[in-house]
């Protein structure tokens, strides 16, 4: 009897066709529609739209907020991951659940909670507002919201790396007289490069597209606190479909580039 070799893959047009039928209306067609409508008025019209002060501010502000958020969460997320992975203490599991809560909480609820804390009538805001300190409806509030929403992504990327790092490396560094800072700088930090890169890309990408918390804490003020997603929403509400599509296409393209680098890095890591 002749036995057919199986290389671990199955060839069939039916499962692939079913998958494509599902993906086309759910993902591929909506994404294609953005670029089709964005270019519907021609290249000149497209360039004119994205050259407007409001559109350029929204795109630039989104990138700045995403960058600042990524840097801050890079520090906070790495510190939290180190504490949760290297120290044993009562309530560690509970604390681990708490720091990951932003993933489960609707972003609009996040925005509401920040307003109730830092807003003009908030628990803290009512004391600092009279002296001229008001983080809400300002860039500071937007950054606070994005830090809250994206914090688990950096933590989730760095913590597994620290858990896999053998304690013997740190102990060896201590035995030759290295300080905690030197051990972190020369032993731990180099090992975290991959986790920081992945967490940074995920944080940046999610910050770029954040809407729910941002719309609550920013006031959606043009040329002040309006991010690209808020600008797109405002233009759709005003009936400026071409304008909204043009900025949406730029934002989508930027997200695709980030995703490409993430996939490429992950693939190289698996191969190595």
Language-model features and meaning:
Residues 2-8, 44, 68-99, 112, ...:
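Transmembrane-helix boundary motif in ABC transporter permease subunits
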Residues 3-6, 43-51, 56, 91-92, ...:
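Membrane-interfacial helix termini and adjacent extracytoplasmic/periplasmic loops
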Residues 6, 36-71, 86-87, 237-241:
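Periplasmic/extracellular loop-to-transmembrane helix junction in inner-membrane transport proteins
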Residues 7-18, 26-29, 33-36, 91, ...:
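C-terminal transmembrane helix and the adjacent membrane-cytosol boundary/short C-terminal tail
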Residues 7-12, 46, 53, 214-260:
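Interhelical loop and adjacent transmembrane-helix boundary motif
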Residues 16-20, 101, 111, 148-150, ...:
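Transmembrane alpha-helices
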Residues 18-22, 32-33, 65-70, 81, ...:
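Alpha-helical transmembrane segments of multi-pass integral membrane proteins
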Residues 25, 60, 64-76, 80, ...:
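Hydrophobic alpha-helical transmembrane segments of multipass integral membrane proteins
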